[in-house]
Every structure is written in structure tokens, then in C-alpha cells.
Design a protein with these regions (language model features):
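Extracytoplasmic cell-surface/polysaccharide-interacting catalytic and binding patches
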Residues: 1-39, 116, 126-144
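Disulfide-bonded cysteines in secreted/extracellular proteins and peptides
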Residues: 14-18, 42, 52, 81
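Aromatic-rich, lipid-facing transmembrane alpha helices and their immediate juxtamembrane interface loops
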Residues: 16, 63-64
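Short linear motifs at secondary-structure transitions and domain/linker junctions
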Residues: 20-24, 49-55, 89-95
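Amphipathic alpha-helical interface surfaces
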Residues: 25-32, 42, 55, 72, ...
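Short amphipathic alpha-helical surface micro-motifs
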Residues: 27-29, 55-59, 96-101
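Extended, low-complexity, intrinsically disordered C-terminal regulatory tails
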Residues: 34-61
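Catalytic cores and adjacent binding grooves of peptidoglycan-active enzymes
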Residues: 64-65, 69-74, 78-144
């Protein structure tokens, strides 16, 4: 079973109640989340990590091969201590000796990117979390 300083098993397990995720969730994903949390300096709320295939199928717009089903993705609420633009910068610049998040997608509620605690970000380690500083991440957003 994976372990993390700032993420409990109840936070990474599937939200449908099946309890799945302990044997699937990426340790690399949790390690990068812990580093992000330390850099931000305030608590981060996790919306979703692992989704079992049945739960994933019930999510509108979710693809069958979702990174959540593979245990390599996490949705994190923008903390109230940062604007969404500031939080996005932290995600983009979080690296350790192995690398950083491979992909992220930004979902902002008011569209401005300047509200505190506004929106959430999807992060994943689909390529092993080895993206190096200066390398492009896979990125999408809905700002605008």
C-alpha cells in the first residue's frame, strides 16, 4: 500500500464506497503531492484520486482509460490561501530530483484566475512523473 505524509488512504480510495485504490494509486503521484503541499504551505483539499471503472463510468465526460482509473491522477481544490493563478504556478514548478507532474488541467469556476480558492486542478503522472524543468507538460484548461 502506498504512503504519504499529507494524504490519508481515505482520500485516495474510490469515492463510490468500494474501497478500491490501495493496490493501484501511484506512489510517485503521492510523493509529488506531498512536495507540492510543503511548497504551498497550507492545507490542500483533494477532490478525487482513484476511481474504480464502475465509478468512473458514472462521471459525465470521463473517458474509460482515465488516469484516475489507472491511479496516476489527482484533482486538487485551489486553496483559499492562493489565487488560482498562484496555485497553477506552484503546480507547474514543483520538481524533485526525479521530475515533476507530467500533465495538468485547470478548471476555474469564475474564469478570471484571480479569485482565492477558485477552481481545481487535475494533475497526473501518466509518464512516471519524470518531466524535467524546461520540458513542456501536457496541459489543458477551461479559462476563458
Amino acid at each position: 500500500m502506498p504512503s504519504a505524509r499529507y494524504v490519508s488512504p481515505g482520500e485516495w480510495r474510490c469515492r463510490c464506497g468500494c474501497g478500491g485504490g490501495d493496490d493501484v494509486v501511484s506512489q510517485r503521484l503521492l510523493d509529488l503531492f506531498d512536495l507540492l503541499r510543503e511548497r504551498v504551505g497550507c492545507a490542500l483539499q483533494i477532490n478525487c484520486v482513484y476511481r474504480c471503472p464502475a465509478h468512473n463510468a458514472s462521471i459525465p465526460g470521463a473517458v474509460p482509460n482515465s488516469q484516475h482509473v489507472l491511479g496516476t491522477a489527482m484533482d486538487i481544490q485551489c486553496p483559499k490561501c492562493l489565487t488560482s493563478g498562484q496555485f497553477k504556478w506552484y503546480v507547474e514548478t514543483t520538481f524533485d530530483e526525479t521530475g515533476g507532474f507530467d500533465a495538468y488541467g485547470w478548471y476555474v469556476y469564475d474564469g478570471s484566475g484571480e479569485s482565492y480558492g477558485d477552481g481545481f486542478i487535475h494533475v497526473d503522472v501518466r509518464n512516471g512523473g519524470v518531466r524535467q524543468e524546461g520540458e513542456e507538460a501536457i496541459y489543458w484548461d477551461d479559462i476563458g
